[in-house]
Amino acid sequence: QDQKSYENFWQSNKLEAKGGSNVTLSSNKVNFTFMPVAAKITISINYASSGGATTKYKNVTATLAGNGIRTGASSSETIEMLHTGDNTVASDKHTFVCILRPGANMSFKLSVSRTLDGASSPEATQQTFTQPAYTFGASKNYVYNFTSSDELILTSVEVMGFKETTVPDNPVSAT
């Protein structure tokens, strides 16, 4: 699934109103609560300096591959991640996001392709990281922080809940 464009990324987000306790009727008004049904993966790569110079890359792409990571099917599926910055400008920092189907025993392989600043074609070898089986929960953002020289080096993983926002009592009036 191509989530490389902002439009495709946002179309992959899904909200659901679940359970009878979330939907109530009072005074000719229906009150309900939406809950995200997906998990978010954020990949942050900070390329290391070489000697005194900072190594910069452009046209960096990130892809996740794994069984059921989009639909829950038992077959292999891929997600092309959204690059959150201007991918045509060389930089030493790159961030990607995607929406992942939550579930138990989920694993994936991250593959990163990159072009060294000043080069005309991508490097021959992709950088990879394999996430072993893990339970990904809905409404969570899993932030993977990497440094890199020739390979991806995982420095931390943070799990954060989606941020809640307050909604005004009467945000939209039908009258």
Question: Where are the language model's segments positioned?
Answer:
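Short, low-hydrophobicity acidic/polar segments
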Residues: Q1-K56, A90-F96, L100-A104, K109-V112, ...
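Short, ordered, surface-exposed loop/turn motifs in non-cytosolic proteins
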Residues: S50-T84, D169, S173-A174
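Active-site/ligand-binding surface loops and adjacent short beta/alpha elements
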Residues: T84-A90
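Beta-sandwich strand segments
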Residues: A119-Q126
